[in-house]
């Protein structure tokens, strides 16, 4: 009997379980299927009866006042090449539509985002946007709230790529001002008036943003009326924010390599003049590396006509690197010229001495012959004039031979002595660093003040 009881117990449990599950489902079905009404909810169908969403509130009367507020979620990308930035914002708009007011409760209604399609909305657009899109994951990122007096709060999440005119003359020591312009596309100031919300004293989220290349230093709000001859005046609200470029990454990636390349080119001043391959290869390598650095740095920038501060510094470094190569060419030319001049002096000096000796011997022989002929002529009582002329000509020729020796004290070449190559290197070791330091002081003072 006990064994039979234990066998029947599971069967009894299986029989009773469906009964409880069915009862639970019936309870849920009763709750869902019941015609439940909340007493304070307004009758939306009654509010929307006769509502014309194609016409603004109070048409024919004063313009609709629309309050705007912004909350910045992120600034994703800032491009100097395209002169644009990408920003994700929450745009809050608030206005009063008396057609939707209700008075039997003071509660604010939070409505489904699909209800937006039934309402009149301001046709706000971003004037300087290149592209924009709404977010719809997991549902459309829209919020709509209705207050008893008919005030509607409409909030949407937008990501937009916005144009920003940049002045890159001081790049990368520059500061840029970018704007986000909001305006009505079709309604003029006679139909709609925009103003910044009273709560918009600061932009939430903007002070917490961490950008890779920039720091947001300040921002401000402006309101103006844009006058179009063909359409009238349109209200425009603008957000201006200042961006200061972070210079640290550029000092590491551009300025420091340039300085090191210039310093590397000075190493050749301590290399011997005889080591021609070493000095030439070092000079050419630094010049080519500097060229590569200039090209790579300019690849991410727009091809603007303005000369940027980074370009100026690159060219300063390029001139110093190239000047170091030219210095070796000049020093090597002087060293080679001195060697050739010394070799020429060694060859011409014995020849000049031999010419002088020959002239002296010739002069002596000529003088002896003339003296002998003079003695004979005196005995005969006559002195021919051609003998005296030849005597003088031989004497003058001998003097010329003696005074026109190459390299004599009165020669022009003796006064134009070439500078020693080692002396040029010694001067370059001091002049190049001093000149580079002076140019850097002028450069940084001009672009940072």
From Swiss-Prot:
Described function: Delta subunit of the heteropentameric ligand-gated chloride channel gated by gamma-aminobutyric acid (GABA), a major inhibitory neurotransmitter in the brain. GABA-gated chloride channels, also named GABA(A) receptors (GABAAR), consist of five subunits arranged around a central pore and contain GABA active binding site(s) located at the alpha and beta subunit interface(s). When activated by GABA, GABAARs selectively allow the flow of chloride anions across the cell membrane down their electrochemical gradient.
Keyword Ion transport: yes
Sugar attachment sites: 103, 106
TM region(s), chain numbering: 252-271, 276-298, 309-331, 424-446
Residue intervals on the Cytoplasmic side: 272-275, 332-423
UniProt record, GO biological process: chemical synaptic transmission; chloride transmembrane transport; gamma-aminobutyric acid signaling pathway
Self-association and partners: Heteropentamer, formed by a combination of alpha (GABRA1-6), beta (GABRB1-3), gamma (GABRG1-3), delta (GABRD), epsilon (GABRE), rho (GABRR1-3), pi (GABRP) and theta (GABRQ) chains, each subunit exhibiting distinct physiological and pharmacological properties.
One Gene Ontology CC term in the entry: plasma membrane
Subcellular location: Cell membrane
Name assigned to this protein: Gamma-aminobutyric acid receptor subunit delta
Reactions the enzyme catalyzes: chloride(in) = chloride(out)
Family: Belongs to the ligand-gated ion channel (TC 1.A.9) family. Gamma-aminobutyric acid receptor (TC 1.A.9.5) subfamily. GABRD sub-subfamily.
UniProt signal peptide: 1-24
One function term, GO molecular function aspect: transmitter-gated monoatomic ion channel activity involved in regulation of postsynaptic membrane potential
Membrane topology: Multi-pass membrane protein
InterPro entries: GABAA/Glycine_rcpt (IPR006028), GABAAd_rcpt (IPR008098), Neur_chan_lig-bd (IPR006202), Neur_chan_lig-bd_sf (IPR036734), Neur_channel (IPR006201), Neuro-gated_channel_TM_sf (IPR036719), Neuro_actylchol_rec (IPR038050), Neurotrans-gated_channel_TM (IPR006029)
UniProt remark on domains: GABAARs subunits share a common topological structure: a peptide sequence made up of a long extracellular N-terminal, four transmembrane domains, intracellular or cytoplasmic domain located between the third and the fourth transmembrane domains.
Keyword Nucleotide-binding: no
Tissue distribution: Found in the brain, in cerebellar granule cells. Expressed in lungs, in alveolar epithelium.
Cystine pairings recorded for this chain: 164-178
Organism for this UniProt entry: Rattus norvegicus
């Amino acid at each position: 009997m006990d064994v039979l009881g234990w066998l029947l117990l599971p069967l009894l449990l299986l029989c009773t379980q469906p009964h409880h599950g069915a009862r639970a489902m019936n309870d849920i079905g009763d709750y869902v299927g019941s015609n439940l009404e909340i007493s304070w909810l307004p009758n939306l169908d009654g509010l929307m009866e006769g509502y014309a969403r194609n016409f603004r509130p109070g048409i024919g009367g004063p313009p609709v006042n629309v309050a705007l507020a912004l909350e910045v979620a992120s600034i994703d990308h800032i491009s100097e090449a395209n002169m644009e930035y990408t920003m994700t914002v929450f745009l809050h708009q608030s206005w009063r539509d008396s057609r939707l007011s209700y008075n039997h409760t003071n509660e604010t209604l939070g409505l489904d985002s699909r209800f937006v399609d039934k309402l009149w909305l301001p046709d706000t657009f971003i004037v300087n946007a290149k592209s924009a899109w709404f977010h719809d994951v997991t549902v459309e990122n829209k919020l709509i709230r209705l207050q008893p007096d008919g005030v509607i709060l409409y909030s949407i999440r937008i990501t937009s790529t916005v144009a920003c005119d940049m002045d890159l003359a001081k790049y990368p020591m520059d500061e840029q001002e970018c704007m986000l312009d909001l305006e009505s596309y079709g309604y003029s100031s006679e139909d709609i008036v925009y103003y910044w919300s009273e709560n918009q004293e600061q932009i939430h989220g903007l002070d917490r943003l961490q950008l890779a290349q920039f720091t947001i230093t300040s921002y401000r709000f402006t309101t103006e009326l844009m006058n179009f001859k063909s359409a009238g005046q349109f209200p425009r609200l603008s957000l201006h924010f200042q961006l200061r470029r972070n210079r640290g990454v550029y000092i590491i990636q551009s300025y420091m390599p340039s300085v090191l390349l210039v310093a590397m080119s000075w190493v050749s001043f301590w290399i011997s003049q005889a080591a021609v391959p070493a000095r030439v290869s070092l000079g050419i390598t630094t010049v080519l590396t500097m060229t590569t650095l200039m090209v790579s740095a300019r690849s991410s920038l727009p091809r603007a006509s303005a000369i940027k501060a980074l370009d100026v510094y690159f060219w300063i470094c390029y001139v110093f690197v190239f000047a170091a190569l030219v210095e070796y060419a000049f020093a090597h030319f002087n060293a080679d010229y001195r060697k050739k001049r010394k070799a020429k002096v060694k060859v011409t000096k014995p020849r000049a001495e031999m010419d002088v000796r020959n002239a002296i011997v010739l002069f002596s022989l000529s003088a002896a012959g003339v003296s002998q002929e003079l003695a004979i002529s005196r005995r005969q009582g006559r002195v021919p004039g051609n003998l005296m002329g030849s005597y003088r000509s031989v004497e003058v020729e001998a003097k010329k031979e003696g005074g026109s020796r190459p390299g004599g004290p009165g020669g022009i070449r003796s006064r134009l002595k070439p500078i020693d190559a080692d002396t040029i290197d010694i001067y370059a070791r001091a002049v190049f660093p001093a000149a580079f330091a002076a140019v850097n002081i002028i450069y940084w003072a001009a672009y940072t003040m």
